[in-house]
Amino acid sequence: MKFFIDTANLEQIRKAHELGVLDGATTNPSLMAKENIRGTENCNRHYVEICNIVEGDVSAELIATDFEGMVREGEVLAALHPRIVVKLPCTAAGIRAVKYFAAKDIRTNCTLVFSIGQALLAAKAGATYVSPFVGRLDDISEDGVALVAHIVKVYRTYGYKTQVLAASIRHTQHIIQCLDAGADVATCPLAAIEGLLRHPLTDSGLEKFLADHARLNV
């Protein structure tokens, strides 16, 4: 499973990259606003900065909600950098845009996916990635991980090439559950990625090794 970091914070992206396990990054308008990045030109420059850090794909989300606007914005985003993936919502206009971009070899990430039906249409339209939102489904007492597993099963059964990118990951357990479900990618906050490293027995074992070494090398 690939690891993407879900943030627009350059410091966090660099920190994840330094671990040596980062495969890409995802952003959205809320994450850009959190970093106080305003205006189209500033956003576009920021996407390029992220691409200069991350060696894999970087999802940049468009703002338009109509088909024509999505096409205009998406073509601009795709031209910024070869590793930019155009991120767009799973709506009627979004599915039309995915089909349009697929015909032009522009890669897409169909986001805000909450049902198997949405995931099916995204794959049929030719999306590169589909992003089911695990945490947001859990928030309304639905099973986000079960949706990931269902999408994986359908895609494998029918041979769809669209990659399942598990999103809205809240904690390390979500990552492990999505791994078990067969997700191709999990996009996570830095804290969740770092959480995979932590285990009390690792800490206590290292402490004992160091103490024993110090005792024998006084």
Outline where the language-model segments fall.
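Glycine-enriched alpha-helix->loop->beta-strand junction motifs that scaffold or abut catalytic
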Residues: 20-24, 80-84, 100-108, 124-131, ...
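A contiguous pocket-lining binding segment that forms or flanks enzyme active sites
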Residues: 111-165
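Conserved, mostly hydrophobic/aromatic
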Residues: 28, 86, 122, 178, ...
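Alpha-helix-loop-beta-strand connector modules within alpha/beta enzyme cores
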Residues: 44-58, 95-108, 144-164, 207-218
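Catalytic cores of alpha/beta
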Residues: 11-19, 69-73, 97, 115-125, ...
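Glycine-rich phosphate-binding active-site loops on the catalytic face of alpha/beta enzymes
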Residues: 29-33, 112, 129-140, 183-202
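C-terminal alpha-helical cap/extension of soluble enzyme domains
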Residues: 155-218
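Active-site beta->alpha loop and helix N-cap motifs at the rims of alpha/beta catalytic domains
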Residues: 3-5, 9-13, 19-21, 27-100, ...
